[in-house]
Amino acid sequence: MLYSLITQLIDQYSFLNVFKYLTFRTGLSMFTSMFVVLLIGTPFIKFFSARKILNPIRDDGPTEHIVKKIGTPTMGGVLILLGLFSGILLWGDLSNYHIWFLLFIVSGFGLLGAYDDYKKIKFKNSSGVSFKFKIISQILIAIVGIYGLTQLSQNTELTNLYFPFFKNLIINLGWFFIPFSIFIIVGSSNAVNLTDGLDGLATVPVILVAACFAFISYVTGNIVFSEYLNIPYLEGMGEVSVFCGSIIGACLGFLWFNAPPAKIFMGDTGSLALGGSLGAIGIITKHEIVLAITGGLFVLEAVSVIIQVFSFKLTGKRIFRMAPIHHHFEKKGWAESTVVIRFWIISIILAMIGLATLKLR
């Protein structure tokens, strides 16, 4: 929006040329998003607290959660999305269809998450919408988004699947690209949602993955860097780095209030939207497998739930004391802050491994 206005004035004011640089606008989007969240965060929390928009706590969860977390406002994802939209709408190139695809995904999943949070708050339990309703809704949103992407995209690489470490291993998915993409978006959304169970646990890994993909989208959209790294050159993909900057800034601002002890939780409004957007970014940058590496913590959390469910249904026994796996370690006696920081460390290591795959081919 503001960027579009500035581009019309560049010929008259040469100092505005700096806005042509993606790195500059990525920084602006990050700081704008962070500033917006920090600015409205405190009144937002007070408003939600006054209206009893509070987070329901699982009855079977760790006792400490029932004691310490009850009465904490939820739906902080609204804060994150307001910050994210502020950054990208001001500093993003809105003529780039990748941006509109990502905005559709983050909005669709954010609205679904908000409805889920509303149900939890209204009925004062942690169940929310049914699993069937949530999955079907996520799939439908992803289908519409992917269909729009395939109609708008001029990228011949869109249906290709690239493998890190193997520079010549490329599989054209053909029609299977659509269900594959749906799986990535829905899976990523739910994985982040499952991870969001402790103060700050999901926020920092989301920041790390978004930072990795800010770099990946930048080099993928640069013909010189992409050729040097032997990764596919995708025209216009650099603009996605501005979107990633907005995610980073919004989450950094939110972390100010979500750091232990959390003053607000992002709820499904935030976790479903952020997870869905990361999945969508992985798809359009053609780094889906790298997404699974950098976001390995989210994968671990999701897999722990799948293992727990299947084990109990098949044998009647649970592998973990509680799933997702972060609750397992709490049940073993780890302090919440210990679990969070150690999981952050794991996420940092995975992010570095993911970035290393760009060169190790």
Curated annotation (Swiss-Prot):
Residues passing through the membrane, by range: 28-48, 70-90, 94-114, 129-149, 169-189, 205-225, 237-257, 264-284, 289-309, 338-358
Keywords from the named record: Cell cycle, Cell division, Cell inner membrane, Cell membrane, Cell shape, Cell wall biogenesis/degradation, Magnesium, Membrane, Metal-binding, Peptidoglycan synthesis, Transferase, Transmembrane, Transmembrane helix
GO molecular function: metal ion binding; phospho-N-acetylmuramoyl-pentapeptide-transferase activity; UDP-N-acetylmuramoyl-L-alanyl-D-glutamyl-meso-2,6-diaminopimelyl-D-alanyl-D-alanine:undecaprenyl-phosphate transferase activity
EC number in record: 2.7.8.13
Pfam families, alphabetized: Glycos_transf_4, MraY_sig1
Similarity field: Belongs to the glycosyltransferase 4 family. MraY subfamily.
Name under which the protein is recorded: Phospho-N-acetylmuramoyl-pentapeptide-transferase
Organism in which the protein naturally occurs: Pelagibacter ubique (strain HTCC1062)
